[in-house]
Amino acid sequence: MTVGVLSLQGSFYEHLFILSRLNTDHIQVKTSEDLSRVTRLIIPGGESTAMLALTQKSGLFDLVRDRIMSGMPVYGTCAGMIMLSTFVEDFPNQKTLSCLDIAVRRNAFGRQINSFESEVSFLNSKITVPFIRAPKITQIGEGVDVLSRLESGDIVAVRQGNVMATAFHPELTGGAAVHEYFLHLGLE
C-alpha cells in the first residue's frame, strides 16, 4: 500500500508526518505520474478554490476523480471534504469531484478567528480535534454513513464506500486514530 497526499496546497506536510509515524509508505502527489503510484489518496485541508484551480491546472482533477470512481480509497479533510462533495451551498457553481453524496457550506463554523477545538466521538473513542474555517455538512445522501458528530448534532465525519471526509483537521493533533481508520478503509 502506498498512500499519496495531494501536495499542491494546504496542510499536506502534517498528513505526511502522521503517515511517517504510522510507518506507512507514502508520497507527495503533484503530478499524474505520482498519482499512478498510489493506492490511496488524502486530500488535505487548505483553501478549496485554490486547490480546485491547482488540480485543474496540473491536470490532476479528472484523474483523481477517475481513480476515486474506480474504487481508490480517498480521505478529505476540511477543504478536501469540500472538494469531494457533490454540492457547495454557498458557492453553487463551484466545481467539485462529486464523489461523496453530501452538500456542504464553506466556513460554516466561522472565520479563522472563530477556530476552535472540540472533543468528538470517533469509532468508540473520544478525540479532540481542531475546526479551522471548517465546512458544515448540511445534507447527506443515501449510503453515506455518519462517523462523528459534534454535541450540537452537526455531522463532522462521514464515509460512503471508499470515500471518507472530516470537517476537522486530525493531522494537526498528533493523534493517528482517523488516519488508522482510513488505512483500513476497504479492507474490512
UniProtKB/Swiss-Prot annotation:
Q: Name one GO molecular function term.
A: glutaminase activity
Q: Provide one Gene Ontology cellular component.
A: glutaminase complex
Domain of life, per UniProt, equals Bacteria
Pathway assigned in UniProt:
Cofactor biosynthesis; pyridoxal 5'-phosphate biosynthesis
Annotated GO biological process: glutamine catabolic process; pyridoxal phosphate biosynthetic process; pyridoxine metabolic process
Query: Which positions, given as ranges, span the membrane?
Result: none
> Which residues take part in binding L-glutamine?
46-48, 106, 132-133
What chemistry does it catalyse, as a reaction equation? aldehydo-D-ribose 5-phosphate + D-glyceraldehyde 3-phosphate + L-glutamine = pyridoxal 5'-phosphate + L-glutamate + phosphate + 3 H2O + H(+); L-glutamine + H2O = L-glutamate + NH4(+)
What's a Pfam family in this record? Answer: SNO
Q: Which family does it belong to?
A: Belongs to the glutaminase PdxT/SNO family.
**What does the UniProt function comment say about this protein?**
Catalyzes the hydrolysis of glutamine to glutamate and ammonia as part of the biosynthesis of pyridoxal 5'-phosphate. The resulting ammonia molecule is channeled to the active site of PdxS.
- Know the name of this protein? Pyridoxal 5'-phosphate synthase subunit PdxT
| Lineage start | Bacteria, Bacillati, Actinomycetota, Actinomycetes, Micrococcales
Quick one: which gene encodes this?
pdxT
